[in-house]
């Protein structure tokens, strides 16, 4: 999971653990932006990125990746690092969703759009969904991209959204949260619907205590996602062998 909305937190995790996914060049871009953010100069940023690669990138060859590293550094220098933090949701917003008397799937998609709207507003951007429908479908917990189309059409009929010619979605609804009570804090933006499902009791999820990813609970003592649990077990095994 590459957290594109909380890049400062993500970069700090990289410095502690190395690469977190197989999208290494994308992650290096986040790391380079972070180094610029904390005040390093261009030459220092390049040195730090290469040091990181030498430590965490098996068989890394600076000459082989020269062009890619240069491109990453140039891109990072001109783009501001993104840190949304947590998105709080109030009881007024939940009540708005449920007042429409639509299906549970509809409610989950609307909740996801609500969070995305709040993210865009926090970044000073217009309230649009402009990612691929396949990615948005995953945020909504839908098994197929095809399932999103009838829901979006229904939302457009209700005046909640406007589907643009380029398939971007303008989010039109507004909820008055005055005197609203904070009931949810969304941190994992790759699995937004999990928070709504948790709140409504449809499913039970936890945030992995290592990476923050929302994962379905399969036992009362579960604290980590599968990947982090595997990594923790490997570390424990190594520590036991040292004794």
Where are these regions (language model features)?
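Modules that initiate DNA replication and primer synthesis
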Residues: 1-104, 125-127, 133-196, 229-230
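Detector for short helical micro-motifs
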Residues: 107-120
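Residues immediately within or flanking Cys/His clusters that coordinate Zn2+
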Residues: 203-205, 222
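Short Cys/His-rich metal-coordination motifs, predominantly Zn2+-binding knuckles/fingers
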Residues: 208-212, 228
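Cysteine-rich micro-motifs
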Residues: 219-232
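Short metal-binding segments enriched for Cys and/or His
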Residues: 229-243
């Amino acid at each position: 999971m590459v957290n594109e909305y909380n890049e400062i937190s993500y970069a700090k995790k990289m410095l502690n653990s190395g690469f977190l996914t197989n999208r290494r060049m994308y992650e290096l871009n986040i790391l380079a932006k972070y180094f610029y953010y904390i005040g390093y100069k261009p030459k220092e940023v390049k040195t730090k990125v290469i040091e990181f690669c030498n430590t965490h990138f098996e068989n890394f060859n600076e000459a082989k990746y020269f062009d890619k590293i240069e491109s990453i550094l140039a891109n990072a220098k001109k783009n501001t690092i993104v840190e949304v933090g947590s998105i709080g949701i109030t009881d007024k917003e939940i009540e708005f969703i449920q007042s429409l008397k639509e299906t549970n799937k509809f409610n989950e998609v609307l909740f996801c759009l609500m969070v995305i709207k709040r993210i865009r507003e926090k970044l000073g951007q217009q309230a649009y969904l402009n990612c691929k429908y396949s990615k948005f479908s995953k945020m909504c917990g839908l098994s197929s991209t095809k399932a999103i189309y009838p829901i979006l059409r229904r939302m457009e009929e209700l005046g909640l959204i406007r589907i643009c010619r380029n398939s971007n979605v303008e989010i039109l609804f507004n909820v008055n949260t005055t005197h609203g009570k904070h009931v949810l804090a969304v941190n994992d933006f790759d699995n937004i619907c999990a928070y709504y499902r948790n709140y409504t009791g449809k499913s039970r999820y936890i945030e992995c205590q290592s990476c923050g990813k929302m994962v379905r609970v399969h036992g009362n003592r579960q604290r980590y996602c599968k990947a982090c649990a595997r990594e923790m077990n490997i570390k424990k095994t190594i520590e036991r062998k040292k004794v």
